[in-house]
Regions:
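C-terminal substrate-binding/catalytic lobe of Rossmann-fold NAD(P)-dependent oxidoreductases
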Residues: 2-41, 123-244
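Anion (oxyanion) recognition and catalysis
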Residues: 10, 65, 120
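Hydrophobic beta-strand scaffold residues
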Residues: 16, 34, 71-72, 95-97
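An anion/phosphate-binding loop that grips the pyrophosphate of nucleotide cofactors and donors
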Residues: 45
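N-terminal Rossmann-like NAD(P) cofactor-binding module of classical short-chain dehydrogenase/reductase
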Residues: 48-49
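Short glycine-/small-residue-rich Rossmann-like dinucleotide-binding loops
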Residues: 52-53, 76, 183-185
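Rossmann-fold NAD(P)-binding glycine/threonine-rich loop
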Residues: 58-67, 74-97, 106-114
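Rossmann-like NAD(P)H-binding beta-loop-alpha module
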Residues: 107-123, 139
């Protein structure tokens, strides 16, 4: 993702200060200034676009908040403690947090909430199916969880109270109101998500397929341009696109 972000930043004509390598040892492109750590990068920048691993989020949150540097975060698979660190940082700086920055997925999230508000949980079972490349380490994907949260908001419930993502063996009948997840991994699939509302007499499906990670990088740069100079707060791509 880093190389695509660099290309999109330059295409937008925005000054690129530099970057740091991820915990997997991947370094920035050779023509990008490399900083020793997140604190050094934050001190030199107005805004940081971050696609590193979840384990780095708490340290990044503290360093960016201390430096007053805005943060566009696209790391998925965050724990409750890591999400809390993001929220704490958002009390001091502008944070745009999204598991997926593509405009298409953002529209899916908006539609999912609206559909869930109209289709009663007692009659329409909500299921989310996602597939990604074989190297992806977290499941369900952050985007799938985001879709689930959108459905839960539309229904006025907490996702944690209705999630069903561990079906195996004899599970018994489906719980009314549950939001189900199925995760597939294989090949080099960039990302595919389908939200299904299944009733006794009809089925509605909403699908997004990503074919190139460039859409994520372009969306992240769009979020960065929107967040630059903005006051503290926790924002999403729906805010960036003016959907709420």
């Amino acid at each position: 993702m880093g190389r695509l972000v660099v290309e999109e930043v330059r295409a937008a004509g925005v000054p690129l200060v530099g970057g740091i390598g991820g915990s997997d040892g991947v370094a920035p492109p050779d023509d990008v200034t490399r900083y020793a750590d997140i604190a050094a990068l934050a001190g030199a920048s107005d805004l940081v676009i971050d696609f590193t691993h979840a384990e780095a989020v708490r340290a990044h949150a503290a360093a960016l908040a201390d430096a007053g540097t805005a943060w566009v975060l696209g790391t998925s698979g965050l724990s409750a403690a890591e999400e809390a660190a993001v929220a704490t940082a958002a009390g001091r700086i502008a944070v745009v947090y999204a598991a997926n920055f593509s405009a298409g997925v953002t529209l899916v999230l908006s539609l999912a909430e609206r559909m869930a508000a109209v289709l009663p949980a007692s009659a329409y079972d909500a299921e989310i199916v996602e597939m990604h490349h074989r190297q992806k380490v977290d499941a369900p994907s952050g985007t799938a969880i985001g879709i689930g949260r959108a459905v839960a908001r539309g229904r006025g419930v907490a996702l944690e109270d209705v999630i069903d993502s561990a079906r195996h063996g004899h599970t018994g009948a489906r719980r009314t109101g549950a939001i189900g997840f199925a995760s597939l991994r294989g090949g080099q699939v960039v990302g595919e998500h389908t939200l299904i509302f299944a009733a006794a007499d009809e089925q509605i499906a909403l699908t997004h397929r990503g074919f190139d990670r460039r859409s994520f990088a372009a969306g992240a740069v769009r979020a960065a341009l929107w967040a630059a100079g903005r006051g503290a707060g926790l924002f999403t791509m729906e805010d960036v696109l003016g959907l709420r």
